[in-house]
Amino acid sequence: MPNHQNMLDNQTILITGGTGSFGKCFVRKVLDTTNAKKIIVYSRDELKQSEMAMEFNDPRMRFFIGDVRDLERLNYALEGVDICIHAAALKHVPIAEYNPLECIKTNIMGASNVINACLKNAISQVIALSTDKAANPINLYGATKLCSDKLFVSANNFKGSSQTQFSVVRYGNVVGSRGSVVPFFKKLVQNKASEIPITDIRMTRFWITLDEGVSFVLKSLKRMHGGEIFVPKIPSMKMTDLAKALAPNTPTKIIGIRPGEKLHEVMIPKDESHLALEFEDFFIIQPTISFQTPKDYTLTKLHEKGQKVAPDFEYSSHNNNQWLEPDDLLKLL
């Protein structure tokens, strides 16, 4: 089976939200390790696109100013594209709670627009990025991403004559991504803050590096049948240990859980254990619906064999068997 380098050779790839942390890392990896024909960055911010164009300076890159809320613009941008990575989202949990309709327009209606445009343009493969907050959601952001996941999974059933395959990749917090807690804590340290705010001493989170996230998406392109949700096996970390790693000499202050926050995140809920398959370094959540063409998710397209998990299995950040200590996080940074 070809590796992702060969698989992307001579392919045109479009990434929505391509100027974000994931998008920039994804584009860099594809440019550096493949002979992709063209990479199209589709996003709203002209300044970020201008800065990215100067930073990367590669003739294979194209930039489209556009919003995923704009179906007509997406249809135009996706002409001649082979692979679409959907990374655009409004993802800030408290802001989504205060601006729910805006979050719904981008994360749900935007997802629907991406699906429709990909079907119209007969895109070969589509992967949508999801989040651990989509499992058992208690906040609006997580609920919109759950809706998005359902839309992408079900798209495999109404594709008609198109051969488009839609899959989802779900993972946890990305170490150092824009707007995340790591740069926030770092800035507090730089500004010589007298204390580091912690919402709850029990809080845990899943963690993955940007490079690991990008590699997992590229590997999922090789593995996918369409309709599955890919979940990597990644470590957890206590938020108190995160504070110790980044600010070992600064006291912490418990400020209480923010709107929409959970104590622990879940990537595979117990109620979905009957759908989960375990592989060496990842899981697959099989779709709840059946498709016109049956798919055997126990065997990936890389011929990796999966096994059913235990009936009461739950993949949560607090019952994980992989843990990051403060020194481990510093190595990742």
Swiss-Prot record:
The keyword Lyase applies. The keyword Nucleotide-binding applies. It catalyses: UDP-N-acetyl-alpha-D-glucosamine = UDP-2-acetamido-2,6-dideoxy-beta-L-arabino-hex-4-ulose + H2O. NADP(+) binds at residues 19-22, 43-48, 67-68, 87, 91, 129-130, 141, 145, 174-178. The active site is at K133. One of its GO terms (molecular function) is lyase activity. Catalyzes the first step in the biosynthesis of pseudaminic acid, a sialic-acid-like sugar that is used to modify flagellin. Has both C6 dehydratase and C5 epimerase activities that result in the production of both UDP-2-acetamido-2,6-dideoxy-beta-L-arabino-4-hexulose and UDP-2-acetamido-2,6-dideoxy-alpha-D-xylo-4-hexulose. Belongs to the polysaccharide synthase family. This is UDP-N-acetylglucosamine 4,6-dehydratase (inverting). The gene is pseB.
